[in-house]
Amino acid sequence: MLSGEAEQLRLKHLVHCRRHKCFARDSGEFCYFELPEDHIEGPAHGVRLTAQGELARSLIREFTQRPLLVERDRGPCVLTVICNCPNLGLHQDLCCHLCAEYNKYRN
């Protein structure tokens, strides 16, 4: 499958997705892949998202004698959803499952 087709399905997911955070809306590298029969998980196909890391900062003021700064650094994350059905191709529900996993990661 061409990267253009995967991009079209990503945009199609974006139209109907109602999640607070959506992989199709945020920046990240989205791709479709196929695994050959001789691969340990093959034959299979699926989608992969490489999400950028994020740095969150907050200030603790309660129960302390002085304000404390807390930083949480989440590095880059690779999320992969693999399907082993005999019908090769990017199924729309793969994008929905990838988005659900993306929300687990981001929350």
Swiss-Prot record:
**InterPro entries in UniProt:** Adeno_E3A
List UniProt keywords, sorted A-Z. Early protein
A Pfam family that the UniProt record links to this protein:
Adeno_E3A
Q: Which domain of life is it from?
A: Viruses
Q: What function does the entry list?
A: Not yet known.
> What family does the entry list?
Belongs to the adenoviridae E3A-2 family.
* Name used for this protein in its record: Early E3A 12.5 kDa protein
Native species: Human adenovirus C serotype 5 (HAdV-5)
